[in-house]
Design a protein with these regions (language model features):
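Sec/Tat signal peptide C-region and signal peptidase I cleavage site
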Residues: 15-19
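Residues that define the transmembrane beta-barrel architecture of outer-membrane proteins
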Residues: 64-70, 103-107, 128-134, 147, ...
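Mid-length scaffold segments of soluble, non-membrane domains
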Residues: 81, 90, 94-120
Length: 176
């Protein structure tokens, strides 16, 4: 009797061990994504609709319908080894109108996608003295070794009017 109980006990322990050797039907997650810092200076021009110029004038800010832009883009690109589409997250801080002795701050938070060939599209909120709006941007990044030169066009429609920008700059591709 003792031997039978001992055998049943050992058999009971062996069943869970056997269950552990079976391959479970679990999806293995992909390897972690890598991020690349693509931060760098940005500069360009912005065309302001008359409504935006008037809105700024109401706030005692007098500028013409075309202003220069200078600033910095803080960008992180998330990619995988497959070389497919990459996701990006960026904050763009610009000062506009410096050539007119005015400093118009602008802050945009953009999220978007970039193709392996460098074509990109992003969307996100934009805040300026003219108000809050949703920015839409698209462009292409030209690459030469580690040097990247983005050419970006942005459209920012708002209640006050529309802003259209063309920005460029550069950054050095560096893994973080």
């Amino acid at each position: 009797m003792r031997a039978a109980v001992l055998m049943l006990f050992c058999a009971g322990l062996a069943v869970p061990v056997g269950a552990q050797t079976q391959t479970p039907d679990i999806t293995i997650p992909p390897p972690p994504l890598k991020t690349v810092s693509l931060s760098g200076p940005r500069f360009g021009v912005t065309a302001l609709s008359q409504g935006v110029v008037d809105k700024l004038h109401e706030r005692s800010i007098d500028v013409s319908s075309t202003i220069t832009q200078f600033g910095w883009q803080f960008e992180r690109e998330f990619y995988n080894k497959g070389g497919g589409v990459a996701a990006m997250n960026e904050f763009v801080f610009l000062l506009g109108g410096l050539e007119q002795s005015v400093a118009l701050p602008s802050l945009s938070w953009m999220v978007g996608l970039r193709s392996p060939s460098g074509a990109e599209f992003g969307i996100g909120p934009n805040v300026t003295p003219a108000g809050v709006a949703l920015a839409l941007a698209g462009g292409v990044t030209f690459r030469s070794g580690s040097l990247n030169v983005p050419m970006t066009f942005a459209l920012v429609p708002s209640k006050a009017g529309t802003r259209i920008s063309m920005l460029t700059g550069f950054n050095l591709r560096g893994r973080r």
